[in-house]
Curated annotation (Swiss-Prot):
SMART domains: Cpn10. Heptamer of 7 subunits arranged in a ring. Interacts with the chaperonin GroEL. Together with the chaperonin GroEL, plays an essential role in assisting protein folding. The GroEL-GroES system forms a nano-cage that allows encapsulation of the non-native substrate proteins and provides a physical environment optimized to promote and accelerate protein folding. GroES binds to the apical surface of the GroEL ring, thereby capping the opening of the GroEL channel. Keywords: Chaperone, Cytoplasm. InterPro entries: Chaperonin_GroES (IPR020818), Chaperonin_GroES_sf (IPR037124), Chaprnonin_Cpn10_CS (IPR018369), GroES-like_sf (IPR011032). PANTHER family: 10 KDA HEAT SHOCK PROTEIN, CO-CHAPERONIN GROES. GO terms for molecular function: ATP binding; metal ion binding; protein folding chaperone; protein-folding chaperone binding; unfolded protein binding. It is found in: Cytoplasm. One of its GO terms (biological process) is chaperone cofactor-dependent protein refolding. This is Co-chaperonin GroES. Belongs to the GroES chaperonin family. GO terms for cellular component: cytoplasm.
Amino acid sequence: MANVNIKPLEDKILVQINEAETTTASGLVIPDSAKEKPQEATVIAVGPGRFDDKGNRIPLDIKEDDVVIFSRYGGTEIKFGGVEYLLLSARDILAIVEK
């Protein structure tokens, strides 16, 4: 896991996108124009969660090092220390990939 000095707030999650495959199973190279936007990422940092109507904090089900599937067009792209990250809201996370 990368050591990043970015701490997400509330229900925000900092992820590093896992690069999509550049070749097919048969060895064909996939051109950039044909690649789909990746939707899988590794969680780098997790915010503490949002507050409910009564002021109780609702923790997130996601933790650092989880691999997640996220909404294709969700999040905000961030470049920090020469590395690209994506800052997502918890609602942008669709699933956790079990190892």
